[in-house]
Swiss-Prot record:
Residues 1-19 form the signal peptide. GO terms for molecular function: acetylxylan esterase activity. The keyword tRNA-binding does not apply. GO terms for cellular component: extracellular region. It comes from the Eukaryota. Belongs to the carbohydrate esterase 1 (CE1) family. AxeA subfamily. Pathway: Glycan degradation; xylan degradation. This is Probable acetylxylan esterase A. Pfam families: Esterase_PHB. Monomer. It catalyses: Deacetylation of xylans and xylo-oligosaccharides. The lineage of its organism: Eukaryota, Fungi, Dikarya, Ascomycota, Pezizomycotina. Keywords: Carbohydrate metabolism, Cellulose degradation, Glycoprotein, Hydrolase, Polysaccharide degradation, Secreted, Serine esterase, Signal.
Length: 311
């Protein structure tokens, strides 16, 4: 029989190795309660930055909110969206994780124009963001049925043009879109990344719900699964992305979901607040038009939580 001292030494060594391994595993995860950068989330074809907020009050099988920043004059960054939006505070209340992607381009707008980003697994910005989501689901045992996406301005365009219903519909359950344009509206025939499309921005790309739906569906050919429900905000005096884009975006998702755009179920004036009008086509589509509001419509965090099903 082995001496007791030898057995004790072996046990202590095993416990020490286990503790070190556990500590190393925890060290690989970002700290809770602060904005942290993640650099090893997987394939990142366009060098998009990943920042994450893990709440101190993390749920056992948490949801995920992807919050995509705006782009004006270089001020739109992951950190700016973290400090200027309510999602980190709401994460502490509801226990979900927030992913804040960071655009890789000078001026910090997103690529919503190239063929790569407008194609499922095409190697664009959208591909990188999708990989952030799958990484977070795996690392935190997140609930894959509770993954949501939101964004403002260029982030709104990335939200519904690329990452969400059009390009990665299988990843997301719902979205809120603040002051964006229809999916594919900024498409560049020269395949320019991070390209600006003045015709679209000025609200001059006008077509039918069926045509818009075909544009969105064409970004993931052959996909027949569920798509995230959409809540679309736009201001009546938006001079950056003119208000016609609101109507075209609503047309698009009415077409995608099979609703009759010209016959919504309900129109509610002064909802959710004075001078806002909410149009509901069905369970999967709402539009909120904000009279007197410019670019962008202010984030309504509590309403987002209700749309996502947290509240």
């Amino acid at each position: 029989m082995a001496p007791f001292s030898f057995i004790l030494t072996v046990l202590l060594y095993a416990l020490t190795c286990s503790a070190r391994a556990l500590g190393h595993a925890h060290a690989l995860l970002p700290r809770a309660g602060s904005l942290e950068q993640v650099t090893d989330f997987g394939d990142n074809p366009t060098n998009v930055g990943m920042y994450i907020y893990v709440p101190n009050n993390l749920a056992s099988s948490p949801g995920i909110v992807v919050a995509i920043h705006y782009s004006p004059e270089g001020t739109g960054t992951a950190e700016a969206y973290y400090t200027g939006s309510p999602y980190a505070q709401l994460a502490e209340q509801y226990g979900f994780i927030v992913i804040y992607p960071q655009s890789p381009y000078e001026g910090t707008c997103w690529d919503v124009s190239s063929q790569e980003t407008l194609t499922h697994n095409g190697g664009g910005n959208s591909n990188s963001i999708a990989n952030m989501v799958t990484w977070a689901i795996s690392k935190y045992n997140a609930d894959s049925s509770k993954v949501f996406v939101t964004g403002s301005s260029s982030g709104a365009m990335m939200t519904h043009q690329n990452v969400m219903a059009a390009t990665y519909p299988e990843l997301f359950a719902a979205a809120t879109v603040y002051s964006g344009v229809p999916a594919g509206c900024f498409y560049s025939s020269s395949n320019q990344q991070d390209g600006w499309n003045s015709t679209c921005a000025q609200g001059q790309v006008i077509t039918t719900p069926e045509n818009w739906a075909n544009v969105a569906k064409g970004m993931y050919p052959g996909y027949n699964g569920t798509r995230p429900k959409m809540q679309i905000y736009h201001g009546s005096v938006d001079t950056t992305l003119l208000p016609q884009n609101y109507y075209e975006t609503c047309k698009q998702w009415a077409g995608v979901f099979g609703y009759n755009y010209d016959s919504p179920q309900q129109v509610q004036d002064n909802t959710p607040q004075s001078n806002y009008a909410t149009t509901t086509w069905g369970d999967d589509l709402q539009g909120i038009f904000a009279t007197g509001v410019g670019h962008t419509v202010p984030i309504r965090g509590d309403d987002d939580m209700a749309w996502f099903g947290f509240a």
